Amino acid sequence: MVTPTKTYRSLAILGTASDVGKSIVATALCRIFRNAGIDVAPYKAQNMSNNSGVTPDGLEIGRAQIAQAEAACVVPTADMNPVLLKPNTDIGAQVVLQGRVCSNESAQGYFRDTSRWAEAARESLLRLKQKHELLVIEGAGSCAEMNLYPRDFVNFRTAREADAAVILVADIDRGGVFAQVVGTLAVIPPEDRALVKGVIINRFRGDSELFREGITMLEEMSGVPVLGVIPYFRHFAIDAEDAVPLSAKVDPAQEPETGKVGVAAIYFPHISNFTDLSPLEHDPSVTLHYLHHPKPLSAYKVLILPGSKNVRGDYAWLQQMGWEKEIRAFREAGGLVIGICGGYQMLGCSIADPYGVEGESGTTQTLGLLETETLLEQEKYLANSEGVLVGTSIKAFGYEIHNGRTTVGANCHPLMNIVARNNHPESDVDGVVSADGRVIGTYFHGIFNEPAVKQWFLQQADSTYTLQPHERGRQESYELLADHFRQHLDVNKLFELIDYEQSLLP
């Protein structure tokens, strides 16, 4: 382990509510501090999300912390997100502890005694502090849920253990920003209130000059300085943490725009890794719609069945909703059907769960659009993988997170040849393509991140599709995000909070 040559005071980014933008603020700050030459790392004690990824050493953490590590230019580790809760029912979740599946817990069971989870989180926090000069800590939900406060080890307890300066993030777009900030500060204990050193107002729309008086009023009412008002900005593609913002985009009334490739994605109750579709959502030549309720799909050229944290349960929902009829009609009309991970399993003939991995044991007969059968095994498979699309020289990069082992019949051929897993040479195959090429399944999450791979898939549906002359990469997106925040933050105050020598400011 390399000992940091300099240490700075940690920053904790806590929120007045869920989905106020804590993850994006933490990501921006990671890149801002990295650009100042600081060895910075992200940390979130507990994350509730079905958007997860795989670290280089084969462990599972939230996608948001992987994105933050990328922004900080450090290798993601399980210590950056020691407790990951992956909801698999309305009242329960799989617990991933320091990168490994630990147990399935009901909400009541999990919160009955959080000491085990809190101790693991504390161990990871201390290890990260020993390895890096600065930690940017992200809280969870509202930091002022007073009924949960004694058991909340993610927000102020973490801030106290890290001796962190707290920045409170509020979302002005949802309204009530004064009540958000002042109300939060009013209900938390005085010793925690004393840790709050600044407020960031996120997602401002319009002319920020019109809010200048509001800043003065908020500072007078709260006694805490406003570090910045961040305008609403959509021009970067960075992985989201959960499906809260996604729910606002489901079942749009309008059809896909003329001249664009229309892509429909089924919005399962337990959808997971919907970040797989981010490259499509941010492609100006694509219209992506998430659909919860079935409807005729003739206006679309591609239908995607994304990942699911409860595959058999979500397939039962799909049947009950009447989706089978629309999927089959779309396939028979020549549409391109793509399944990713759980969606891939649903495209096959059956999914067997003899061990009750996702709930009640049993076997579910599925769509039968691919000649495959899937067995859910007790051990979860995790890997960062690299492949080459069959019949091309196009390289694909992705990560695998699945309990399913899928066997393939004779009338299908592989989607890609696997050449490496976890940086070790590999000779294997992934995925399935139907005989006519209109149904494709893969276990690769992040399959569309590589522009050439995205182009290959979309050209199977629309031969006229071409990539934009300049597609922004992830690192460029982090720079764009950091620049946006620097323009609207009091950077001097920000660096002052971490005890950074002002003469060294970039």
Curated annotation (Swiss-Prot):
Tell me which Gene Ontology terms the entry assigns under biological process: cobalamin biosynthetic process
List residues of the GATase cobBQ-type domain: 260-453
| GO function term, MF aspect, one | catalytic activity
Which residues are named in the active-site annotation?
Answer: C341, H445
| Record's keyword annotation contains Cell membrane | no
Query: Under which pathway is this protein filed?
Result: Cofactor biosynthesis; adenosylcobalamin biosynthesis
**UniProtKB keywords:** Cobalamin biosynthesis, Glutamine amidotransferase
HAMAP family named among the record's database cross-references: CobQ
Which family is this sequence assigned to?
A: Belongs to the CobB/CobQ family. CobQ subfamily.
The name this protein goes by in its record: Cobyric acid synthase
Query: What species does this protein belong to?
Result: Chlorobium chlorochromatii (strain CaD3)
Q: Which gene encodes it?
A: cobQ
